[in-house]
């Protein structure tokens, strides 16, 4: 009997391991993407326009991938239309919109810390409405990860917080939680690539109305910019940086996150995704020469410990 149980548990354990690997790769790519985007924004391209280009480029890329691989996967049933539109709006477009609005009024670290309340909201939702048993280790991992993020942004330094900025960041946390929960539901009915293709399609529609594409400052992407920091002697055209943001900063990591939800719960995916600010901070220090104190390094270690703790809660 025990041998049969072990045999059945092995595929599940392998699936969870694969799921965590997908999230960690995605979080790493998102973290690197922060520095790439910062260099792209130094060209004068606004953060909202970069987000618009990110969504449109990812939409085109993902649609082409699905059309080549399995055109039938793009079939859209009438009863899916509203669900996918909501996913594209809340799960893709609004996460970026409210995050960018928040960082106009708050330090990036503070905004990111508030946004990563999202996994805590997922855990609360799972416990209160999803009738999902959330293990004590998961709650401990959430507390540990938020503590680590607080250390990384050195929250105790007495920063005066802008009320509207905090409100935007809190909305960003809510829509980030919605993204995880909506994606966890939708992957039961379609593959991760076609799901993200439709998600970015509806996000692109949103940006088309919010910022018409015909007013996009296309001339800016032809400019060449310095890579700054330790790579200041190197220059790349802005379009190459935008291409990175689209492919390795959007298509690949978003698809990996959604694919991981087939194997790992949204709560645990959210915790593992907290690797993003750790990677973002380290890359910015190594590349852009942004300062990194011993306390921030300790905070990064605490977040990594939280991710490992969540992984052990089976």
Tell where the protein language model's regions lie, with residue ranges.
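Hydrophobic/aromatic residues within transmembrane alpha-helices
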Residues: 40, 50, 54, 102, ...
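Helix-helix packing/entry segments at the starts of transmembrane helices
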Residues: 52-53, 96, 110-117, 182-205, ...
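Transmembrane alpha-helices of multi-pass small-molecule transport proteins
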Residues: 2, 21, 42-94, 121-125, ...
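Glycine-/small-residue-enriched transmembrane alpha-helix faces in small-molecule transporters
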Residues: 2-53, 158-185, 206-209
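Specific transmembrane alpha-helical segments of multi-pass solute transporters/efflux pumps
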Residues: 29, 34, 63-111, 115, ...
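C-terminal-most transmembrane helix of multi-pass membrane proteins
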Residues: 2-12, 55, 154-155, 238-240, ...
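Juxtamembrane helix-entry segments on the extracytoplasmic side of multipass membrane proteins
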Residues: 14-19, 44-52, 76-82, 154-175, ...
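Hydrophobic transmembrane alpha-helices of multi-pass small-molecule transport proteins
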Residues: 62, 125, 134-155, 173, ...
